[in-house]
Amino acid sequence: MNGGRLPLLVIVSGAPGAGKTTLGRTIASRLALPFLSKDELKEAIGEKVGTPADVPASQRLGLAAYSVLFGMATRILEAGGGAVVESNFRRGQSEPELRFIVALADARLVHCSAAPPTVMRRYAERYQRGDRHPVHLDAQRAGALADDLASGRFEPLDLEVPTLVVATDDGYAPHLDEVVEFLRAEAGVGGGPILVAQS
């Protein structure tokens, strides 16, 4: 660790199709941090064990990917390194595991937000184009996504860390440079102000 300071942990959250992976990878590049994506880990596992036969099997692969993600993040943070972790973490469900790694770090949450019609359109377009790995079975899960959006499961996580909500409907609001500045700000700003971009 640098001067006794905790390492930086950036958690990138939001619904499928909200732009998390693109933003998370860009943040990791700008901050020179490793990028840990649950979906990328799930795809790597799927390449070895095969495409799941149904949604429950796909979900089991997702749980395995989460185990790898949290294990890798823990090792990196315990060694004093920072990381960017990205997934469609669910409010009211994902917080317990995240709090374990948050306790090891100077953690910040970047939550990607887009209007539900935008999310559903992007979600459909990417699997129709064949952009998504078959391990995700996206075509079979569109109905579940609509339900999750309506339920609020993809609202910002309850982690009591500094939180920035980034609107991704048309580019980034706030802009990328402002997002990076938020992440580079000094630690010790208190527990979890939620900053929402005004359009």
What are these regions (language model features)?
Residues 12:
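Hydrophobic anchor at the beta1->P-loop junction of P-loop NTPases
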Residues 19:
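Conserved glycine(s) of the Walker
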Residues 103-124:
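Conserved phosphate-donor/acceptor-positioning beta-strand/loop module used by diverse small-molecule
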Residues 5-9, 81:
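Pre-Walker A (Motif I) flank of P-loop NTPase domains
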Residues 16:
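The conserved Walker
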Residues 128-176, 197-199:
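Small-molecule kinase domains that catalyze NTP-dependent phosphoryl transfer to phosphate-bearing small molecules
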Residues 61-106:
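Glycine-rich phosphate-binding loop used to anchor ATP phosphates in small-molecule kinases
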Residues 22-79:
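Conserved substrate/cofactor phosphate-moiety recognition/catalytic segment
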